[in-house]
Regions:
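Active-site entrance/lid segments in N-terminal catalytic domains of soluble metabolic enzymes
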Residues: 1-178
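Residue-level detector of alpha-helix initiation sites
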Residues: 30, 185-186
Length: 324
């Protein structure tokens, strides 16, 4: 079920197994075995940060469980896609684990993909690199990335700044490989628009936080259902970098959104909100929650397969209307 007027740059071995050109975005403390399995079985790509597993041994167990779970479907499922954070202590060990499992796709973030590309290519794995600027795109292409994930304004958590229309078209002028749009994709209509814009896939994160299979708390899910676009706050206060967070969660944590320190450094933000000491403030991602502009599309807590079903119907209708 893809845009009829644009060929996908994805390899056929992957594209043919997708019901939708969609990645359930890898989200810290949210994406785990159950969510990834449900999404892959429903026909979309399920992604997760390797850092969500507490150790490399747990990561190995997670991958084994996901592989077994999707195999039980009895037919080819959509791929699962680990997200490898480059600048983290477990990078080499996590990379080696992914190589042992011969995963089909990996997303790299927070740093150049260069150190990961060759080992992953050696086992036939596609490498997608997170980028937030044209310079990032150039560097990722030079490093050998197979695909680019464009982090744009409206993405939840650590976010981008660029307008998605301008960013996608500028990247398409220099790169003909797979492009993924990340930020503000609310439903199947937006997914269809991303395909027409020139993307091969799109991220959807916020919608899947509210899925029953996510690792989010019930309170987090309820807040997503109760929130709209106007409840998203762009702030540097908790990470030292721009992040899209739920304003109601900041208030619930006892802070005044109008009086946050927007000049804080990454190190100081980590000290205050990273949860490493008792003197700090509320823990980011645990007590202060992220969401993207697509939060207005979260209307209920449902299963991941139900979300994929809804998006698929909207996606199909969007192209039927466009063809009329």
């Amino acid at each position: 079920m893809h845009a009829p007027d644009r060929r996908s740059a994805l390899p056929a071995a992957i594209a043919q197994r997708l019901r939708l050109p969609l990645i359930a975005a890898p989200m810290l403390r949210i994406s785990g075995v159950d969510l990834v399995t449900a999404v892959c079985r429903a026909g979309a790509i399920g992604a997760f940060p390797t850092a969500n597993a507490g150790s490399v041994e747990e990561l190995d167990a997670w991958l084994t469980r996901i592989e077994r779970n999707v195999a039980e479907l009895g037919r080819p499922a959509a791929p699962h896609c680990p997200n490898l954070i480059i600048r983290q202590p477990r990078f080499k060990d996590d990379l080696a684990c992914l190589v042992r499992h011969r995963v089909e796709m990996v997303i790299t973030s927070v740093g150049s993909p260069a150190a990961a590309v060759q080992p992953l290519h050696d086992v036939g794995c596609l490498v997608f690199a997170d980028i937030a600027s044209l310079r990032h795109a150039e560097k990722a292409i030079e490093a050998g990335a197979d695909g680019l994930i464009l982090l744009t304004a409206g993405a939840g958590g650590q976010t981008g700044w660029a307008n998605p229309f301008a960013f996608v078209r500028a990247v398409r002028a220099m790169f003909d490989g797979p492009v993924v749009l990340a930020g503000g994709v609310t439903d199947g209509t937006a997914l269809a628009a991303a395909r027409l814009l020139g993307c091969d896939l799109a991220y959807m994160g916020t919608r899947f936080i509210a899925a029953r299979e996510s690792m989010a708390s019930d309170a987090y899910r309820r807040m997503l259902v109760d929130s709209t676009l106007d409840d998203i706050m762009l702030t540097k206060a908790f990470t030292g970098l721009d992040a899209s967070l739920l304003r109601p969660s900041i208030v619930a944590a006892g802070l005044d959104p109008a009086n946050l320190d927007e000049s804080v450094s990454e190190a100081r933000a980590r000290e205050k909100f990273g949860g490493k000491n008792d003197a700090g403030g509320p823990r980011r991602w645990i007590e202060v929650w992220s969401a993207g502009h697509s939060v207005s599309g979260v209307h209920a807590v449902t299963g991941a397969a139900d979300i994929v079903d809804e998006i698929a119907a909207q996606y199909r209708l969007a192209f039927e209307i466009g063809a009329a």
